[in-house]
Amino acid sequence: MCSDKNITATALVRPSWLRVKAPFSDEYQSTNELIKSLKLNTVCKEAACPNIGECWSKKHATVMILGSICTRACAFCNVSTGKPEQVDEYEPYRLSEAVMKLGLKHVVITSVDRDDLSDGGASHFAKCITYIRERSPTTSIEVLTPDFLRKHEAWKIVAKARPDVYNHNIETVPSLYLKVRPGARYYNSLNLLHQVKIFDSSIFTKSGIMVGLGETKHEVLQVMDDLRAAEVDFLTIGQYLRPSARHIDVGRYVTPDEFDYYAKVARSKGFLMVSASPLTRSSYHAGEHFEKLKQMRLQNII
């Protein structure tokens, strides 16, 4: 059973289920070299993802467009904050080159927040989708966008380019937003996801939250209900891991049994797909999950 009690993680040793092997393989090195040669950023490195070794060894990577400097300063995130670089107009082409050379069946594109841009970078997302469609027409495309706060209908620019999956992470429960995600608004994120689904119901919508930040079980279940009300198809739940001493503390380490509980409840609430485990991240096994999403939708139609 899942407990509401938050056990402090101060001075706690990271449990065995959160330990991963250091990245080291020929495939990992070749993926790393290609990404560097094309001058692309990845959230895998910038956000210090624990799954980088496994994913890059399989030639899977989540590309981060619009630079590596974010205009927000979320308490959980390892991406640098400051004044962003100018938008690189050649980046969509280089990204399409990487997708083609890696032979990707599924690509995930994310970005830093770009509050300095009039559309938050939405048109750049759309260009990336268009270039990939032209050069790798069989590759499925998943976007993980910012919230486009105060950028009127910027999400629609991305949705019109017709990604296969539109992901926007809710990140945490409403009561922790001021502490964890102060530059964002919970209901703005919910509305974005719902508007995408209303605009084009064929686009799979996806969102994720981190646990272990101080939330209660009841709050997590309420987020599930809110996301289902917004017609979100796919939910991911993973353990928050503190990137450095300057980031927000881990409240507790959530056990694998608790993740199983959350997954079971989420499925009962009607999500087409649920991925809930300590090491789950938004784009972890994204290609496999996309294929399963398509199968689940077909089963529901039949």
UniProtKB/Swiss-Prot annotation:
<protein>
    <recommendedName>
        <fullName>Lipoyl synthase</fullName>
        <ecNumber>2.8.1.8</ecNumber>
    </recommendedName>
</protein>
<comment type="similarity">
    <text>Belongs to the radical SAM superfamily. Lipoyl synthase family.</text>
</comment>
<keyword id="KW-0949">S-adenosyl-L-methionine</keyword>
<feature type="binding site">
    <location>
        <position position="283"/>
    </location>
    <ligand>
        <name>[4Fe-4S] cluster 1</name>
    </ligand>
</feature>
<keyword id="KW-0963">Cytoplasm</keyword>
<feature type="binding site">
    <location>
        <position position="77"/>
    </location>
    <ligand>
        <name>[4Fe-4S] cluster 2</name>
    </ligand>
</feature>
<keyword id="KW-0479">Metal-binding</keyword>
<dbReference type="Pfam" id="PF04055">
    <property type="entry name" value="Radical_SAM"/>
</dbReference>
<keyword id="KW-0808">Transferase</keyword>
<feature type="binding site">
    <location>
        <position position="55"/>
    </location>
    <ligand>
        <name>[4Fe-4S] cluster 1</name>
    </ligand>
</feature>
<dbReference type="GO" id="GO:0051539">
    <property type="term" value="F:4 iron, 4 sulfur cluster binding"/>
</dbReference>
<dbReference type="GO" id="GO:0005737">
    <property type="term" value="C:cytoplasm"/>
</dbReference>
<dbReference type="InterPro" id="IPR007197">
    <property type="entry name" value="rSAM"/>
</dbReference>
<feature type="binding site">
    <location>
        <position position="44"/>
    </location>
    <ligand>
        <name>[4Fe-4S] cluster 1</name>
    </ligand>
</feature>
<comment type="pathway">
    <text>Protein modification; protein lipoylation via endogenous pathway; protein N(6)-(lipoyl)lysine from octanoyl-[acyl-carrier-protein]: step 2/2.</text>
</comment>
<feature type="binding site">
    <location>
        <position position="74"/>
    </location>
    <ligand>
        <name>[4Fe-4S] cluster 2</name>
    </ligand>
</feature>
<dbReference type="InterPro" id="IPR006638">
    <property type="entry name" value="Elp3/MiaA/NifB-like_rSAM"/>
</dbReference>
<dbReference type="InterPro" id="IPR013785">
    <property type="entry name" value="Aldolase_TIM"/>
</dbReference>
<feature type="binding site">
    <location>
        <position position="49"/>
    </location>
    <ligand>
        <name>[4Fe-4S] cluster 1</name>
    </ligand>
</feature>
<dbReference type="InterPro" id="IPR003698">
    <property type="entry name" value="Lipoyl_synth"/>
</dbReference>
<dbReference type="GO" id="GO:0046872">
    <property type="term" value="F:metal ion binding"/>
</dbReference>
<feature type="domain" description="Radical SAM core">
    <location>
        <begin position="56"/>
        <end position="272"/>
    </location>
</feature>
<keyword id="KW-0408">Iron</keyword>
<feature type="binding site">
    <location>
        <position position="70"/>
    </location>
    <ligand>
        <name>[4Fe-4S] cluster 2</name>
    </ligand>
</feature>
<dbReference type="GO" id="GO:0016992">
    <property type="term" value="F:lipoate synthase activity"/>
</dbReference>
<keyword id="KW-0411">Iron-sulfur</keyword>
<keyword id="KW-0004">4Fe-4S</keyword>
